[in-house]
C-alpha cells in the first residue's frame, strides 16, 4: 500500500513487476492488436471494474475523455463509476511510471459493455525483451 488517508477517503497501491528473460532468444510481448485485431491492444497492467461501473466516465491527460482515449498515450487515466444501490461513486486513478518502457503507455479502456483499463506497453507494437535483460514495470493505482 503506497498511501492511506482515511480523512481524505483515499488509498493508493504501488505495483511493481520484474521479469528477466532467461532464455537464449528474445521474449516477445504482443497483444491481439499486434496480431491484426483493431482496438484490442490490452496487455500489461489490466483492471476490470465492477458491473456497476459500466458506462462510467473516462478521463486522461491533455483533456482526453470518453471511449476516444482507447489507443491514446497518457501518463495517467482516471475511471469514475457508481456503486450499486448507494448512489455513491468512486474514482480509480492509474499512473504509469516514467521509468516504464514506452512511457507514457497507450491505454486500452472501455466503459461499455463493462469497465476496464489496461496500461499497455505493447498496445499495437511488439516489445522484445532480449536474453538476460530484465523488464521492470511500476504503477500506482
Regions found by a protein language model. Name each.
Residues 1-34:
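Acidic, contiguous internal or C-terminal segments within carbohydrate-active enzymes
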Residues 13-15, 45, 137-139:
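Hydrophobic residues positioned within well-ordered beta-strands of beta-sheet architectures
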Residues 90-141:
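Beta-strand-rich recognition/accessory modules
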